[in-house]
Design a protein with these regions (language model features):
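Non-catalytic structural scaffold of enzyme domains
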Residues: 1-236, 246-293
Length: 293
């Protein structure tokens, strides 16, 4: 069996896997990007459920995961209950907007949520707000263009290009008087340092990485000790500081796959396939290629 399988519409959720490996390097981990159905953020509720359910079926057969981390806010808020119902033999950990954390750091009581259209429009956000931030105003911004930019350009664009891509969203939240912005799409985590450079010092940037990883580790009986309030998760070019110099012999899943590995479900052309190879090289993980049906 594989300890953890991470799923997302693209490569945005990789920082979750890298953070878990920083905490527990001997874990067997597989990352599956459903690139054939990217982007998820513009799909209907029913479409998201259909795509994710089919994806998990393939993953279950191929990797026999103990835990699946749904490293995608859109997948989580739309399909998590369905997945738990359909695959009761697998433990699922979802990712949802870090509204509670944002409320704890906001002094103005105005919180920004940057996410996909599907996440922004999901009523679950209102439930989270009423439960954890009832005295705060929640300002949302759907930015599918930024998600697409990160998926296809994050690891080749210059820092200046990345900051230019992020700036319109932050200008919007600044004009709305927000002093905390939630990165409500896992793709944005690859740009954490870029967001901070554009936001700080007047706007705090928050995400759900440590909370999700803590939950995933606890399911398999491991503890999470916070190394710092703002750990060096992934630097600008997408290279985990831990993995940059290597971390010894790779783990192997019981199915024989090297761990950690990245699999995709489709690509547009050879150039795009090569981009995934480059990405894997920078993260220090194996590229498994296409996930077979």
């Amino acid at each position: 069996m594989t300890d953890f399988v991470f799923i997302d519409s693209g490569v945005g959720g990789i920082p979750y896997m890298m953070r878990l490996l920083e905490k527990k390097p001997d874990s067997s981990c597989i990352y599956v990007a459903d690139t054939a159905n990217f982007p998820y953020g513009e799909k209907s509720h029913a479409q998201v459920i259909k795509c994710v359910t089919e994806l998990v079926g393939k993953i279950r057969e191929r990797f026999a995961p103990k835990v699946i981390v749904v490293a995608c806010n859109t997948m989580s808020v739309n399909a998590l209950e369905e997945l738990r119902s359909n695959y009761s033999d697998i433990q699922f950990v979802g990712t949802v907007p870090a509204i509670k954390l944002a409320a704890s750091v906001s002094k103005k009581r105005r919180i920004g949520l940057l996410a996909t259209k599907a996440t922004c429009e999901n009523p679950y956000n209102l439930e989270l707000k009423e439960k954890f931030a009832s005295d705060c105003a929640l300002v949302t911004r759907a930015d599918g263009e930024l998600v697409s930019f990160i998926e296809h350009n994050a690891f080749t664009a210059s820092r200046e290009e990345c900051m230019k891509a992020v700036k319109p969203a932050i200008d919007f939240f600044r004009a709305e008087g927000c002093d905390a912005v939630i990165l409500g799409c896992t793709h944005f985590l690859n740009f954490t340092d870029v967001f901070k450079a554009v936001c700080e010092p007047d706007i705090r940037v928050v995400d759900s990485v440590d909370g999700v990883v803590r939950h995933a580790l606890e399911i398999l009986g491991s503890s999470f000790e916070v190394l710092g309030s703002e750990p060096p998760l992934v630097d600008f070019k997408g290279v985990s500081p831990l993995r940059r110099e290597g971390s010894g012999k790779p783990q192997v899943c019981s199915e024989g796959e090297p761990s950690p590995s990245l699999f995709i479900t489709g690509f547009r052309d050879t150039e795009e396939e090569n981009q995934y190879n480059v990405l894997c090289s920078r993260f220090g993980i194996q590229f498994g290629g296409l996930l077979s049906k």
